[in-house]
UniProtKB/Swiss-Prot annotation:
Cysteine disulfide links: none
Record's protein name: Large ribosomal subunit protein uL18
GO biological process: translation
Annotated source species: Synechococcus sp. (strain CC9605)
Biased composition (Basic residues): 9-21
Region of interest (Disordered), ranges: 1-25
Keyword list, A-Z: Ribonucleoprotein, Ribosomal protein, RNA-binding, rRNA-binding
Pfam family, one: Ribosomal_L18p
Length: 122
């Protein structure tokens, strides 16, 4: 029997989750992508197939003020606060959280908690 790699497990979880999670114009989807070095968050309206706002550790606005490495929990907190601020500026109060197949732990949890603290409801 062959072992399933960690990446394949994440992809399998993501496909399973996306069957049940969709974003609407009333309640868009907060999608999170985590790489080894960076973290990205987008607020997506799946009905219109458009990205309403986004934030990541590669944003110039965030890179200048960020003292922690881009792959750390502190950077995830900063991205969560920034995406929540940008969503609130567009009038978005509630979102559906899409963890992208990643476990709700570490950097993903830090981003989600920071977005909640900044005012997003999910």
């Amino acid at each position: 029997m062959s072992q399933i790699s960690r990446k394949q497990q994440t992809q399998k979880r993501h496909r399973r989750l996306r069957r049940h999670i969709t974003g609407t114009s009333d309640r868009p989807r907060l999608a999170v992508f985590r790489s080894n070095n960076h973290i990205y968050a987008q607020v997506i309206d799946d009905a219109a197939q458009s990205t309403l706002c986004s934030a990541s550790t590669v944003d110039k606005e965030l890179r200048t003020g960020l003292k922690a490495p881009a792959g750390s929990c502190d950077a995830s907190v900063a991205v969560g606060e920034l995406v929540a601020k940008r969503a609130m500026a567009k009038g978005i109060q509630q979102v559906v959280f899409d963890r992208g197949g990643n476990l709700y732990h570490g950097r993903i949890k830090a981003l989600a908690d920071a977005a909640r603290e900044a005012g997003l409801q999910f």
